[in-house]
């Protein structure tokens, strides 16, 4: 069967691939979007049951469609988010083909462009957009060996408390996923140990405005790079149960045991860094700094927003902070499960072109790779802090589509003298 030809192949039909399709269509660029599973599959099957979007409905959406929920301040459940993307594909008539996996992309030896092998046949294309995002392969540290009576799963495999065996739970990682899962388990009556590393801890809301609004008006969504020394700092924010500021001191007051970064495992014991107090202090400082900036903004503009003294209240230091736990014998304290909320890595093994660094990360500028014709979409900090959010990837997709359209204008350019000669030939031929 001959290879199918199209201009641009978009790999992945999550939020990035769908946004890419909309902007390519706006430019009239022929394209196909391939998805190995279903549209927005990760939202349906790689998240826990109670997950909601971390931003309110008015914010975490594409500009051209609202969520069906009439409450625009609601945090949308994961299934409704997936349905939103399915509906959006229909709205823009995106050429999505599900159940097709891209196996290999190589540069063509002649004629320019790329040869693409997929489970649904071969393609010849001029441009590739890798819209698979950054959250592909779960990272589980090879720290604790398998053992009878100890269940170990990554956060992407966690669904609900009933899934775990009876007993205490160790959660490693206190970003948004780890913090939300740990709180859910605690509220379900489990004894939870939470390993807390460096983190940002923004207020869920302050003085009547969600933190997404504050990051917008304060210009923080448009930061192009992380601050010095914060490249690997995670963000702890939650929309669960209507949305509430993640406060690790509050967790401890309710019975959760906090520990520092997980470092090693020896003879049945986990060992933790002596950094819990510093990590909590830096998270608190981040929280208060945003409140201070918000207050200054309100005063400068003379806004009539209500005071919010509750957001500045601080829970007392718990015993686990003043007398930190440095080692934990899992059997002794009854830990029967470990949940690794330790992030994800990228897998671009199918993309066999020279545009990756020594660590396998894409070399690109705002999604435009160093390999002509190859583009990336959905990466954290692709162009700004907001790039990982639904609205942010939509704007990044526009930039990438505009770049592809510009390349088209170069390829179709003809000098005026040549164009006039071609017109004359055409007139004679049709004379």
Name each region found by the language model:
Residues 40-64, 251:
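Redox-cofactor-proximal catalytic regions of oxidoreductases
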Residues 2-45, 75-431:
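Flavin (primarily FAD) cofactor-binding/catalytic cores of flavoenzymes
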Residues 62-66, 378-380:
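A short small-residue
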Residues 68-72:
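A short acidic, helix-capping loop that chelates divalent metal ions and anchors anionic groups
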